[in-house]
Regions:
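A short acidic/small-residue loop/turn micro-motif
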Residues: 135, 146-153
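Mobile genetic element proteins and their domesticated derivatives, centered on retroelements
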Residues: 9-10, 20, 41, 56, ...
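Double-stranded DNA-binding cores of transcription factors and transposases
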Residues: 1-9, 13
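RNase H-like two-metal-ion nuclease catalytic core shared by retroviral integrases
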Residues: 91-93, 178-180, 186-191, 201-220, ...
């Protein structure tokens, strides 16, 4: 058997010993970099267990790696998120319905349009129900409730929470939008809305309530389901934690990569001509700039709604 030295082998294949060493060092440096990012990803995932890779990248913003490479590497490492569909119907249709007041509406600030919806979650083989009320403009969850039934009491609890801390004068002209579920035409629920001079709006399709539908998926798929809850008591505790983390720590591209709480605080300090304007349009309704004022410019639409800014 003929023996060869490493230097002879390097010469045959056209590389140098220094080149091999440099390559090894680069690989070690990259490996250490990825391990460091993994530590940050794991820490973030403990609070936001279902957060997608692209959102994780923008949240962490690692300097040494681009978005696409980050997503590719961490997908291979098993950090991808499986999205679940929602096959269970929670809407019990009501005979009395209200007109859709928000289609095509311009929203220019907090407490102008709230959306609400009910969703379900299975815990230890039993269904429980979650009600959320969302401020469309800031994406902030204003109120929520956890229940073991579909009666209107949970909706009233969520609404009372949403109303707390908002001065009455800021609610005049606010529109509360929901689907046509019977919980939303309950006498006690309607009385609360009317007492605070909040207009009532309803949509006939899921697309008409898509902001609230999206929040259902975010709270369930990014928080509650990955936490593998085992009891009703745990569900209530972790739903509270999920809402808090969502409102204060989950960043949104539409909000300039701020959390809802950060965005609302920043928005109040902005001059009026620098505040974002949003047009509410359902998924199947074509968007037309001609219907808007000339000083409102369309920007890219990541979701079925257009985020706009006045120049």
């Amino acid at each position: 058997m003929i023996g060869y030295s490493l230097n002879q082998l390097y010469k045959v294949v056209g590389i140098t010993k220094q080149g091999v060493w440099d390559h090894f060092q680069r690989e070690q440096t990259e490996l250490e970099m990825i391990r460091g990012i993994m530590t940050r990803v794991d820490k973030r995932r403990k609070q936001h267990p279902g957060e997608g890779l692209e959102k994780l990248y923008w949240q962490l913003q690692p300097e040494q790696i681009g978005r696409d490479k980050f997503c590719d590497i961490f997908m291979q490492l098993g950090y991808g998120v499986v999205r679940r569909k929602n096959p269970v119907r929670t809407t019990i249709p009501a005979h009395k319905v209200f007109e859709n007041l928000i289609e095509g509406r311009l929203v220019t600030g907090p407490n102008q349009v709230w959306q609400s919806d009910i969703t379900y979650i299975s815990v230890s083989g039993r269904f429980y129900y979650l009600t959320f009320i969302l401020d469309v403009y800031t994406r902030r969850i204003k109120g929520y409730a956890v229940s073991d039934n579909l009666r209107a009491e949970a909706n009233i609890t969520a609404l009372k929470m949403a109303l707390r801390g908002v001065p009455p004068q800021q609610l005049r002209g606010c529109v509360h939008h929901s689907d046509r579920g019977s919980q939303y035409i309950d006498g006690g629920y309607l009385k609360l809305l009317r007492t605070h001079q909040i207009a009532i709006s309803m949509g006939g399709r899921a697309q008409d309530n898509a902001y609230a539908e999206r929040i259902n998926g975010v709270i369930k798929n990014e928080y509650l389901i990955p936490w593998s809850l085992s009891s009703y008591r745990e569900l209530k505790y972790y739903c509270k934690k999920a809402v808090k983390d969502y409102n204060t720590k989950r960043h949104h591209g539409t909000l300039g990569r701020c959390s809802p709480a950060e965005y609302e605080a920043t928005w109040r300090k902005l001059p009026k001509d620098q505040r974002r304007v949003e047009v509410i349009r359902s998924e199947n309704t074509p968007y037309s700039k001609n219907k808007l004022k000339s000083n409102v410019i369309d920007t890219s639409c990541q979701y079925p709604y257009c985020s706009l800014r006045i120049n």
